[in-house]
Amino acid sequence: MRYSPAPAALYIRNRKRLTQKLKSNSLALFNSNDIMPTNADGTMAFRQNNNLLYLSGVDQEESILILCPDFPDKRYREVLFLRETSEQIAIWEGHKLTREEARHLSGVETVLWLSEFPKLFHHLMAMGGVLQVYLDTNEHYRADVVVETRNARFIDWCQKQYPLHTYERAAPLLAELRAVKQPEEIKQLQKACDITNLAFRRVLSFVNPGVKEYEIEAEFIHEFIRQGSRGFAYTPIIASGANACVLHYIENDQACKPGDVLLLDVGAEYGNYNADMTRCVPVSGRFTKRQKDVYQAVLRVMRGAMKLLRPGALYFEYHREVQRLMETELLKLKLIDKTDIKNQTKEKPVVAKYFMHGTGHHLGLDVHDVGNMYHKIVEGMVWTVEPGIYIREEKLGIRLENNVVIGKSGLLDLMKNIPLEAEEIEDLMNAR
């Protein structure tokens, strides 16, 4: 394993917090993700079901976790099932978790091979007084699930085998729990941000006119993997010039031109936790006056947004306050005038022409992490703060983004060590 996993105490605590939310006489079950195919016999890199990972720390395919907190025999209140390894598997695929390793990793005492699952599952359902079965689905508000998952196949099988049980949704419970980060999770997120910092500093000494966007992408991935990350937390955006005005530009195939500003929206993954950073740098090493004016405007909005982001705030009200900060800056930049402000509507705010996306999102095991955007922001949540100004007619896009932990009396900025001031970025680029 290239990353240091969180201690078992985290997963023990997470399971306890979940079981406290279950109804009496319940069973909850979580499957690992499938290994997804590409073409022929090719497969994508395995990525674990984050709910299973959150509850067990097990980062391996063909795994199942059962929680049955009211079962009479304490041995079976928590059971973890693993794929049984063999000499052939070890030769062809490498090491798989032993039962003892899984116990140490997860804190689950009863670890069995997957072949034992059918018999024990039936025993729990028949003899455990189980009334409710909590099953796992992807209910993220942005999800568009078109591929049948391992969890979906199990739901279909389970409901056919046990049609008279009551079925409950595990996803809302996990979303509520995962939205508030534990100290061990914040440590992993900080590590992802620290790796991102190292890579960004490397890139500052590399960017020059004529460099291809994908060459910059290569510099990031080199440093990420060198530092123990498995790579990018999401598809990177390396957008020079007019490309920065395309919010999800991912081709990364153009040359950086003299005088352009380069937008970098990248983050490292570490231990399945994710960083999400955006910085903008001058390709030639110095911002023009206009570029710096726009940069400073975005930076002021970012800092103003951080002051507004606090426990008890509601995201959509917070975002509207940030839009008002942006109005002031767009006026100063002469991108809008007072007539534009007077004629705007709630449905079509004047800032939307130049700032058309949200101010932030939950961050954690998922880049756009689970959590209800309509619920109040609470202490322990991790959010991105990412205002931007996109001036297509000037081929200029500036977005700045940091990751912050919501505290009782202020924010913990996980990216405080990543260069942000325009002058610091210029100095680092010209010190090479």
What are these regions (language model features)?
Residues M1-R432:
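Active-site neighborhoods and metal-handling regions in enzymes and metal-associated proteins
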